[in-house]
Each structure stands twice: as C-alpha cells, then as structure tokens.
Swiss-Prot record:
It is an enzyme of class 2 (transferase). It is found in: Cytoplasm. Keywords: Amino-acid biosynthesis, Arginine biosynthesis, ATP-binding, Cytoplasm, Kinase, Nucleotide-binding, Transferase. NCBIfam families: argB (TIGR00761). Belongs to the acetylglutamate kinase family. ArgB subfamily. It catalyses: N-acetyl-L-glutamate + ATP = N-acetyl-L-glutamyl 5-phosphate + ADP. HAMAP family: ArgB. This is Acetylglutamate kinase. Substrate binds at residues 68-69, 90, 187.
C-alpha cells in the first residue's frame, strides 16, 4: 500500500469523525430485510453484521427489526402448507402462525444474532410478541374490509424492555410477530414494525435495508437515484408511479416515523458492501433519505 492509498483511508476516517461524534448515544433502528438474507453466500450477511457491530462499537445504540418472508414460505412448504396472499399480505390461519412464529424466532432471528455475534457485536434476540402488542388487521390499504386471520397492526411497543437491553450493552434483534389483544401471536409487517419501534424509541435514524438502491426516478435506471425526499413530495411521487405498490409500506412507515419525531429515514441497498456505513458516515450518502 502506497502513501496515497494510506492517506485516502485516513481521509475516509476523518470524514466519518463528525458523524461519529454527533451520533454517539443516539438510537438507530435498522430494518434488516431483502434477498441478501437468503443468499447461500454468507458474505453479504457478514458485511451487514460487521456494519451493525461497528455502529455499536462507536457508541450508537442499534436496534434491529428483521424480516423473513422467504424463510417462512420455505418452512410452510416443508410443513405441507400453502401460502396465500391477498394484496401482497399473507393469509395466516392457526397452523400458519405457528410456523411463522417458529421460523422467525427460532431460525431467522437466531441467524441474524449469530451473524452479529460473529462480527463482534452483542445481539439479544427478542421475540416480537414479547415487546409488541397489536390489534387484528381488519381493513386493507384502501380501507376495504379484509380478514387475513392472524395478521395484526402494532398498537404498542414495550419501550422499557427494549431500552433495558440497550442499557445493558446489547443490540436488540426483534422479530415481526406481535401479541394480539387475545394473547395469541400475530404476523405483522416488518417494515411497519420498524417504523413503530423507531417512533416509540424516539430514534435518531430509521434505516431500511432492501434490494434496491433507494427511490429511483426511473425504476429501470439505477443511476436515477433520488437522494433526498421531503414529506411534502411523497403524494406527487405516488401519482407519478415513482413510489410503487411494493415501496408503499416502507414509505408509509417512513412518513409516520418522521411525523412522530424520527429525524431522518434512509432507504439503502443491503446488497452493496457496507452501504449502511456509507449512508450514515459520509457527506453524500448512498441511498435515499426522507426528511420533514
């Protein structure tokens, strides 16, 4: 390595310094999802885990909410159950919720925790229904009546339990399952869970990691990334089709989180090496940030 390369590395560290100083002690909620979670090559998951461990090492209080839809589908197939979807939402009967909870808590959550632990972090797996309360979902996104079975909408986050783990030096890793008013587990949308958790914890940042670079003005052109979106622009972007159906739950959650005190929400590509660090600790960033 020559002097120029060494100096360039030092410049990267110096660019990160003011962000590290500013964010120390802040809460960041990271929604960990996307196809890279299912990639047979563990390199992508390892990179993300190292980024999460790095955030914790520099004094940022990280809370992780993970998805796991593909793992659930595989587990259902192995159990002889058929996955049915209504407007993108999984119908969940008693047999299905048992598979959902077992897969999320005992397989996906454990895998995420193992990856973070392997990177030097201190993860603490938290079954979602130990910290999330929900009501049964009775309408779809358009307000039409719908019965999806054991599918809920989070109404309460048990902040004290999560903050206790943070105070004890852990990275809470929460699965998207909530306890219903009837005491039974319910399947809940992980994107919406991340937003509710961020709002309840008064998080400084909410970061969504998925399979796209962020919000694209032209979905066919990865170079058309929109770096910053203000809440007031969102309706227009929906009308133009820039915010499509697949992105709407994330954007809806981002809007609500911003309205409830989260300072910024970021959409980044989890497949890109160290995208989390590049978004948080560089001046330009690498994804799309949503602001008030």
């Amino acid at each position: 390595m020559n002097v120029a390369e060494i100096t360039a590395k030092a410049e990267v560290l110096l660019e990160a310094l003011p962000y590290v100083q500013d964010f120390r002690g802040s809460i960041f909620v990271v929604k960990y999802g996307g196809s890279f979670m299912d990639d047979p090559d563990p390199a992508g998951r390892t990179r993300v885990a190292r980024d999460l461990a790095f955030l914790a090492a520099v004094g940022i209080n990280v809370v992780v909410v993970h998805g796991g839809g593909k793992a659930i589908t595989r587990a259902m197939e192995s159990s002889g159950l058929k996955a049915n979807f209504v407007n993108g939402m999984r119908q969940t009967d008693e047999a299905t919720i048992a598979v959902v909870k077992k897969t999320l808590d005992e397989v996906v959550n454990r895998d995420v925790c193992d990856a973070i632990g392997g990177a030097g972090g201190k993860p603490k797996g938290m079954p979602g229904d130990s910290v999330l309360v929900c009501q049964k979902l009775t309408t779809d996104d358009n307000g039409n009546p719908v019965d999806l079975g054991y599918v809920g909408d989070v109404t309460e986050v048990k902040v004290k339990l999560i903050k206790k783990e943070i105070a004890d030096g852990f990275i809470p890793v929460i699965s998207p399952v909530a306890e219903g008013y009837d005491g039974k587990p319910y399947n809940v949308n992980a994107d919406l869970v991340a937003g509710r958790v961020a709002s309840a914890l008064r998080a400084r940042r909410l970061v969504y990691m998925s399979d796209v670079p962020g919000l694209l003005a032209n979905p066919a052109d990865p170079e058309s990334l929109i770096s910053t979106v203000k809440v007031g622009q969102i309706d227009d972007l929906k009308k133009k089709g820039i915010i499509d159906k697949g992105m709407r739950p994330k954007v809806q959650s981002a809007m609500r989180a911003l309205q409830e005190g989260v300072q910024r929400v970021h959409f980044i590509d989890g497949r890109l090496a160290h995208s989390l660090l590049l978004e948080i600790f560089t001046d330009k960033g690498i994804g799309t940030e949503f602001v008030q």
